A protein has these predicted regions:
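Alpha-helical structural signal in soluble globular domains
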Residues: 17-24, 44, 48, 73, ...
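Short, surface-exposed acidic-centric catalytic microdomains
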Residues: 25-65
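Charged helix-capping and loop-helix junction motifs
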Residues: 65-71
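N-terminal Rossmann-like dinucleotide-binding module
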Residues: 1-40
Length: 189
């Protein structure tokens, strides 16, 4: 069974979705890692008995030092893939050159890279927004796009649009994980 590591910073709703829909079915979540000791997602990892690493990013003077510790933790668990699921850190080449990872981003990349992507997507002139799953690279939200899912604006208010983006991102994340792992199985044959 393929193994993944999941990185998160906040509520952990995407971690919970992965655990509910994939863990011990399609793959094994071998570790959940957060950079925030107060992150809500910690409870999901505990509930599922998943090994949990808390690496408080505020205790490091440099981003590279944090990333080195993160790489060390991930490598210990030997995942086939690392998944950034609401992990709110800009990663340096210390991470991106050593860890194979995908990221969930709440816009149709290359539009609206970085923070506040949902808000910026909602306010732009396009009729649709959406989510992207992409490979993690040293460029912020700049890695190869694996898949995208659109969300029509259709005169929705912001709360309705945001809710739909958050609903669809979980589905896209699961599809992206399975797609990458399946692609790697085919290439390995």
């Amino acid at each position: 069974m393929k193994k993944i590591a999941v990185l998160f910073s906040g509520t952990g709703s995407n971690l919970a979705y992965i655990l509910e829909h994939l863990h011990n079915k399609e793959l094994e979540v071998v570790v959940a890692i957060t950079n925030r000791p107060e992150a809500g997602g910690i409870e999901f990892a505990k509930e599922y008995g998943i090994p949990l690493e808390i690496i408080d990013s505020t205790t490091f003077d440099k981003r590279e030092e944090f990333d080195a510790e993160l790489v060390h933790a991930i490598e210990y668990y030997k995942p086939d893939l690392t998944v950034l699921a609401g992990f709110m850190r800009i990663l340096t080449p210390v991470f991106t050159d050593n860890i194979r990872a995908i990221n969930l981003h709440p816009s149709l990349l290359p539009l609206h890279k970085g923070l506040y992507a949902i808000e910026r997507s909602y306010e732009d002139e396009n009729e649709v927004g959406g989510v992207s799953i992409h490979r993690v690279s040293s460029d912020l939200d700049g890695g190869k796009v694996i898949l995208q899912k659109e969300v029509a604006k259709d005169g929705r208010d912001f709360e309705s649009y945001e809710s739909e983006v958050k609903r669809i991102e979980k589905i896209a994340l699961v599809e992206g994980i399975l797609s990458v792992l399946k692609e790697e199985l085919i290439l390995a044959k």
